Amino acid sequence: LTATSGDTGKAAMEGFCDVAGTKIIVFYPDGGVSAVQKAQMVTQGGDNTCVAAVRGNFDDAQTAVKQVFAEVGGESLLAGKGVRLSSANSINIGRLAPQVVYYFRAYADLVRRGTVAVGERVDYVVPTGNFGDILAGYFARELGLPVGTLVCASNANNVLTDFIRTGRYDKKRPFYLTSSPSMDILVSSNLERLLF
């Protein structure tokens, strides 16, 4: 089960398309993805893929998916029927590992090209919605990569940039549909992983 603001949904459905023993259901906010993203998802082939629009925004779709995972007793009920659930989006911490790796790869490429010297710090500006990619940069720094400043870039739904600036997380604010739907988020799944 996964919620998407566009790109993850198509990528996940394509990745699991006709893979034996799997099914994938993707939920996206109706009116909250681009026309191209919607077309890619609703025309996805595969006997094991399903996509559905939900009323509301990405946060509503993601909250519903999280509730399925949090359902008390639901996991054992599903396991009894041979069903195990996973998610392809930011609520799955397994998604962070490859994101950490590409910070190291990007740094190695900069060193190889002679753009930076080994040990020289590099700043990263990261468009941020669910806080996963920038959190991966933080983890890369904790693992020893010479990361300088991590800049959290946002759009009009700037709940994270406001939080970083003020220390106050205020999700009760106007929600805007923008031309960058992956950042059209007010409830960031990965921020709690940094704080706790």
Name the predicted role of every residue range.
Residues L1-F196:
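PLP-dependent amino-acid enzyme catalytic core
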